[in-house]
Regions:
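Peripheral, non-AAA+ core regions of ATP-driven protein-machinery
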Residues: 1-24, 28-237
């Protein structure tokens, strides 16, 4: 195939751990490894690169199933959340998928329980445990006797830390049963001492926020261009 300049697709299946089943030689013999991710109950699919000998693996493709088959998704952010009335336990953030900025809704449910448990869908469980420990230590919020459930809307899996502040906001909102304005976004990474750290591509994220008609931004550092948003700068929680 190589001598004839023919492209060959090798399709395999994935184990429960998320790796390619079978011997590793399958990965080594090819130039590109792509994972097609997505919940079967949702229309969106994400094509993500894990190996590319000829370019970057940081880019993603987002597709949706339509009557014409699988097509490239337009206005992607609007498919990951809905801007209805304000409800407790909901906060918005902007994440980066490759070079794309996406508006994402973080949903939290906190309820008292005799046998508390934590569950996270689309957000790393270990990072959730760290954020809950920060809330107990720094803000003295007694979450030890509460169930905490986190969900990232749209079936997105967050692989960066810029959503930390939004997760914290959603948890506090649910715990106090006080809604957060749908016009606000939260962008920031939290350190172990509660400091809110600067994040990359802030200007691009704020540009996406303006596109989605957000009005307020809670961020850790001053951007080059606020994009007309009212920015609040937070150094720690």
């Amino acid at each position: 195939a190589k001598s004839q300049n023919i492209c060959v697709f090798i399709i395999g299946h994935i184990t429960k751990e998320g790796s390619i089943a079978g011997p590793r030689v399958l990965e080594h013999m090819v130039d590109v490894v792509l994972y097609f991710e997505g919940d079967a109950s949702r229309e969106l699919r994400i094509l993500r690169g894990f190996k590319n000998r000829f370019g970057s693996t940081s880019e993603v493709g987002i597709f949706e199933m339509s009557q014409q088959g699988l097509v490239s998704a337009n206005e992607v952010s609007s498919k990951f959340f809905t801007r209805g009335g304000a409800m407790s336990g909901s906060a918005f953030t902007i994440i980066m998928e490759g070079s794309r900025a996406l508006s994402i809704e973080i949903q939290a449910l906190v309820c008292e329980s005799a046998y508390p448990k934590r569950s996270s869908t689309g957000f790393e469980r270990n990072r959730l445990d760290m954020l809950l420990a920060l809330l107990e230590r720094k803000l003295e919020i007694p979450l030890g006797h509460y169930d905490v459930f986190i969900n990232v809307s749209g079936g997105v899996k967050i692989s960066e830390t810029a959503a930390d502040l939004a997760v914290i906001a959603a948890i506090i909102s649910s715990f106090k049963n006080r809604p957060i304005s749908k016009d606000s976004i939260f962008i920031g990474e939290l350190s172990l001492n509660g400091e809110i750290r600067e994040i990359f591509n802030l200007d691009q994220r704020l540009k996406e926020a303006k596109t989605q008609k957000f009005k307020n931004a809670i961020i850790p550092n001053k951007p080059l261009d606020t994009q007309g948003l009212k920015c609040f700068y937070a150094k720690d929680i």
